[in-house]
């Protein structure tokens, strides 16, 4: 039978999702736990790989097994053998036609950014950080240039293995929690009394290139700090050159929210942690 799992993890201690020699990845830990519970080797396929330090709210994987267990048995049994920073949230039996990657119609990411004159402490590793006030309207205007189908070469890592740089961004939402933003009489980028707040950037697209979200974040923050006007984003996109864009932003605040599937598969589209993020 084929089983799908929803997996959440804090990626701070791992070298990314994909299995590597040494076993210090989320996939290695998950497959080891599944093998101990199922008493046979298990090979998983995920909806979307994440880099070192990137977190997952609802990574979806599938695997094949001769065992027939109840969904919650897979959840509780696998979690028994997982470390505290990885947890299976749900399990569902699925038809053999289901494929965690190929069946996905979209993927979603969120970046949580702390704006504060003081670096994060309890949130360390779980949020990005800027100590300049950001202009939300400017960042939203810049983000609109990225919506739709484009060649995202300017936001692609040199090690990216995707066959094509052409992807479709369906949605970019930028929201703010707290009293931040640019105070009256203070220009973007001024290092005066920066109000503390959290910014949440949410991205939805058919697929993403390696480092694409982090490279977009670098550009959005540059615009938010007043280093470039909003229409600079269009110029970066049209340049089709990584050199045209801002440096890759920190992985700390990046979360893979999970894939979206046709409702006919009957899989959850989010976990409770979605509403926990600022």
From Swiss-Prot:
Keyword Transmembrane: no
Keyword Isomerase: yes
Enzymatic reactions: uridine(38/39/40) in tRNA = pseudouridine(38/39/40) in tRNA
One GO biological process term: tRNA pseudouridine synthesis
UniProt xrefs under InterPro entries: PsdUridine_synth_cat_dom_sf (IPR020103), PsdUridine_synth_TruA (IPR001406), PsdUridine_synth_TruA_a/b_dom (IPR020097), PsdUridine_synth_TruA_C (IPR020095), TruA/RsuA/RluB/E/F_N (IPR020094)
Keyword set, alphabetical order: Isomerase, tRNA processing
CDD domains in the cross-refs: PseudoU_synth_EcTruA
Residues at the catalytic site: 51
EC number from the UniProt entry: 5.4.99.12
Positions contributing to substrate binding: 109
GO molecular function: RNA binding; tRNA pseudouridine(38-40) synthase activity
UniProt similarity note: Belongs to the tRNA pseudouridine synthase TruA family.
PANTHER family on file: PSEUDOURIDYLATE SYNTHASE (PTHR11142), TRNA PSEUDOURIDINE SYNTHASE-LIKE 1 (PTHR11142:SF0)
Assembly information from the UniProt record: Homodimer.
Role: Formation of pseudouridine at positions 38, 39 and 40 in the anticodon stem and loop of transfer RNAs.
Protein name, UniProt field: tRNA pseudouridine synthase A
Name of the encoding gene: truA
């Amino acid at each position: 039978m084929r089983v799908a799992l929803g997996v959440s993890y804090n990626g701070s201690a791992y070298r990314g999702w994909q299995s590597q020699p040494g076993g210090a990845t989320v996939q290695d830990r998950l497959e080891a736990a599944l093998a101990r519970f199922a008493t046979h080797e298990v090979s998983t396929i995920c909806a979307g790989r994440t880099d070192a330090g990137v977190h997952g709210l609802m990574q979806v994987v599938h695997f094949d097994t001769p065992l027939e267990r109840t969904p919650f048995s897979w959840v509780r049994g696998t979690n028994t053998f997982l470390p505290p920073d990885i947890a299976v949230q749900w399990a569902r039996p699925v038809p053999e036609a289901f494929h965690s990657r190929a069946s996905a119609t979209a993927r979603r990411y969120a970046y949580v950014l702390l704006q504060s004159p003081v670096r994060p402490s309890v949130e360390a590793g779980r949020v990005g950080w800027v100590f300049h006030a950001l202009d939300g309207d400017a960042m939203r205007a810049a983000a609109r240039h990225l919506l739709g189908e484009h060649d995202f070469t300017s936001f692609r890592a040199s090690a990216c293995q995707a066959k094509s740089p052409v992807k479709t961004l369906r949605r970019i939402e930028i929201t703010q929690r707290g009293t931040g933003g640019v105070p009256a009489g203070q220009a973007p980028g001024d290092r005066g009394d920066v109000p503390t707040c959290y910014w949440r950037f949410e991205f939805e697209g058919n697929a993403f290139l390696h480092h694409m979200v982090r490279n977009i974040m670098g550009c959005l923050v540059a615009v938010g700090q007043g280093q470039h006007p909003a229409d600079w984003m269009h110029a970066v996109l049209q340049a089709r050159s990584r050199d045209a864009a801002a440096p890759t932003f920190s992985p700390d605040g990046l979360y893979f929210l999970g894939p979206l599937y046709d409702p006919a598969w009957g899989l959850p589209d989010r976990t409770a942690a979605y509403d926990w993020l600022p």
